[in-house]
Amino acid sequence: MTTMAETQTWQTVLGEEKQEPYFQEILDFVKKERKAGKIIYPPQKDIFNALKLTPYEAVKVVILGQDPYHGPNQAHGLAFSVRPGVPAPPSLQNIFKELHADLGVSIPSHGFLEKWAKQGVLLLNAALTVEAGKPQSHANIGWHRFTDKVIESLNDHPEGIVFLLWGSYAQKKSQLITNLRHRILKAPHPSPLSAARGFLGCRHFSKANQLLHEMGRGEIDWALDEKVS
């Protein structure tokens, strides 16, 4: 017997949304901006990496970000993650500090979080593109409608998911998560401006694993390999 989770994919839950005029307008806007010579992050091929690397049926944990990193070579389509060889930005450094304090895992020399994504951690930004050097420059081009739909589709997921909502922006999305099978953990944002107000010490990584264990879903190995293949 196949379960609903096995029969559903991002394509089946988001296919109709991608046919909506607004979605094509987003893609057209980004294309025109690039054509006009503006630098847009992440590269075109990486925009939907979060959905490519973490299949719908495999999602166990969701970490929400606001928009992609806006510096050179940083963003590659996974919230908070940076490409191999790029120094971890301050928020990610604080994530690693908390991970070390919580689970004792060593702080990696890189900030490439693909290993998490491949285990079922959806690293989703609310806006999927940004203009170089201009944070939140694409916050109002329609991405939020699409990524809200992603969250709503996860609310309908047949298995329990742990949502890690860091900062007031991410926490507003909790109104989209109404299904009682899911669990929500909230903390301040890991940015240097707010990490000391409760992100550091939140122990969300061990708590997420405990909740996954209780739901019979299998825990996440949060430790990152020292070498990135």
UniProtKB/Swiss-Prot annotation:
Gene3D superfamilies: Uracil-DNA glycosylase-like domain (3.40.470.10). Transmembrane segments: none annotated. It is found in: Cytoplasm. Belongs to the uracil-DNA glycosylase (UDG) superfamily. UNG family. This is Uracil-DNA glycosylase. It comes from the Bacteria. Excises uracil residues from the DNA which can arise as a result of misincorporation of dUMP residues by DNA polymerase or due to deamination of cytosine. The active site is at D67. Its EC number is 3.2.2.27. It is an enzyme of class 3 (hydrolase). GO terms for biological process: base-excision repair, AP site formation via deaminated base removal. InterPro entries: UDG_fam1, Ura-DNA_Glyclase_AS, Uracil-DNA_glycosylase-like, Uracil-DNA_glycosylase-like_sf. The keyword Transmembrane does not apply. NCBIfam families: PRK05254.1-1 (NF003588), PRK05254.1-2 (NF003589), PRK05254.1-4 (NF003591), PRK05254.1-5 (NF003592), ung (TIGR00628). SUPFAM superfamilies: Uracil-DNA glycosylase-like. It comes from Coxiella burnetii (strain CbuK_Q154). One of its GO terms (cellular component) is cytoplasm. Coiled coil: none annotated.
